[in-house]
Design a protein with these regions (language model features):
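Active-site glycine- and acidic-residue-rich loops that bind
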Residues: 20, 90-101, 150-159
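Short, electropositive alpha-helical surface patch
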Residues: 2-6, 91-109, 143-144
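Core AdoMet radical
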Residues: 1-23, 27-66, 83
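Flexible glycine/acidic-rich beta-alpha junction loops that bind and position SAM and/or redox cofactors
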Residues: 22, 44-53, 81-96, 112-137
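Non-ligating segments of multi-cofactor redox enzymes
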Residues: 59, 68, 72, 122-130
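A structural motif corresponding to the C-terminal end of an alpha-helix
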Residues: 6, 65-81, 111-115, 169
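C-terminal accessory regions of radical SAM enzymes
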Residues: 148-182
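C-terminal accessory region of radical SAM enzymes
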Residues: 115-147, 178-204
């Protein structure tokens, strides 16, 4: 609410399974009431693929979360935006966003009557758990080389750190969500931006 009051376009990186957990039943309604754009990870539209990556039951909980968002008006038209994210597994780059999005829309609609607005394909950064996995399998250098040879200056204008900030649950601000994963705060918070507080030195 405070961010919206500042005239900021707010995006919620939503864990779909949380929407169905006890104590969070009103989250979807809150997001809709405040016209918050929702972005959620959905690695596949097939149950066996998702559960093999995220754990048993994650797919069905995610589907129920998407259905709930649809009931609140998300993904139906252009007003309440519901966008999904695809991340590839292993040392590979994501497929064409333009080619994958129609398949997602077709399958989720046919199988579960779910609608969404856009599908974003994101290349994995070799950090945190993914980076550790690459190192343990001896694939880190190979993946870094793949990123290097696949570099395209055409992509630079669209990188999210040029137009967005990430904010964690405590209000700390990061210049991209990858730096948020690494705990590298940008040195300010929503409170500080509003002139109300400062970020502790150990968070800068």
């Amino acid at each position: 609410k405070r961010a919206k009051a500042l005239g900021v376009h707010v995006i919620d990186r939503c864990n779909l399974t949380v929407l169905m957990e006890e104590g969070f039943e009103d989250t979807a309604a809150f997001l809709a009431e405040n016209n918050v754009e929702v972005i959620a990870s959905m690695p596949c539209y097939l149950e066996e693929n998702v559960d093999s990556q995220r754990g048993k039951g994650v797919f069905n909980a995610s589907i129920e979360g998407l259905k709930l968002l649809n009931r609140k008006g998300y993904g139906i038209d252009g007003k309440l935006q519901l966008n999904l994210v695809f991340n590839p597994q292993g040392i590979s780059l994501p497929p064409s966003q333009c080619e994958l999005e129609p398949a997602y829309k077709k399958e989720l609609k046919k199988r579960y009557q779910i609608s969404f607005n856009n599908l974003y394909t994101i290349t994995n950064m070799p950090i945190k758990r993914f980076g550790s996995t690459l190192l343990s399998k001896g694939l880190f250098d190979e993946y870094m080389q793949l990123l290097k040879v696949s570099h395209s200056e055409d992509n630079l204008a669209g990188v999210m750190c040029r137009t967005t900030l990430s904010v964690d649950w405590q209000g700390y601000v990061y210049d991209c969500d990858f730096n948020q994963m690494l705990g590298l705060a940008a040195g300010l918070s929503l409170d500080k931006a509003a002139g109300a507080a400062t970020v502790p030195d150990n968070k800068t």
